[in-house]
Design a protein with these regions (language model features):
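Catalytic cores of DNA base-excision repair glycosylases
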Residues: 2-188, 192-195
Length: 197
């Protein structure tokens, strides 16, 4: 991974399934809160087939405490779809990942780049913040047309990249630990501090 990166259970074995589970759990939930849920969930449901076949009451019990239960319901619907259409293996194709229930551009990008080394961006709020700060652009990062433009530009930069998953994870890590949203960013620790605001 990246020098100085946090040790996280989903990074130890970044299979498509484990990347998917972690990214869905991490939506609107802090990393430290997700760790024990991830461990318990993947121990009981180690693959797509187990998730697809899990009784709903047990599935919801495993998710209890994370909230936003539609996330796990959508995961199970997607798991059934993956079993039916892809033989239980998450597709190594960004566009096909996007067609799965509950998977948007960020999650599809994370799975494709981290698990399959496909050069597509995984752009979340942290990454948008980094890119706008480095570019000294004060455009509202919540503006959809601006987000689309940044994703397109990042996709172009990533073409031909040997380790797109590591690149995406490095950006995520930088945004979570150095180029933080609240409080003062730790600019002296940033590898891009000479280019930035």
């Amino acid at each position: 991974m990246v020098c100085g990166a946090r040790v996280l259970p989903w990074r130890e074995e970044p299979t498509p399934y484990r990347v998917w589970v972690s990214e869905i759990m991490l939506q609107q939930t802090r990393v430290e809160a997700v760790k024990p849920y991830f461990e318990r969930f993947t121990k009981r449901l180690p693959d797509v087939e187990a998730l697809a076949e899990c009784p709903e009451d047990e599935l919801l019990k495993l998710w209890e405490g994370l909230g936003y239960y539609n996330r796990v319901r959508n995961m199970q619907k997607a798991a059934v779809q993956v079993m039916e259409e892809y033989g239980g293996k998450l597709p190594a194709d960004y566009e096909k990942l996007l067609k799965l229930k509950g998977i948007g551009s960020y999650t599809a990008g994370a799975i494709a780049s981290i698990a399959y080394q496909i050069p597509v961006p995984a752009v979340d709020g942290n990454v948008f913040r980094i890119l706008t700060r480095v570019a000294a652009d004060d455009t509202d990062i919540m503006k959809p047309s601006f987000r689309t433009l940044l994703e397109k530009e990042l996709r172009e930069v990533m073409q031909g990249m040997e380790m797109p998953g590591a690149f995406n994870q490095a950006l995520m890590e930088l945004g979570a630990t150095v180029c933080v949203p609240n409080g003062a960013p730790l600019c002296e620790q940033c590898p891009w501090n000479s280019l930035c605001l």
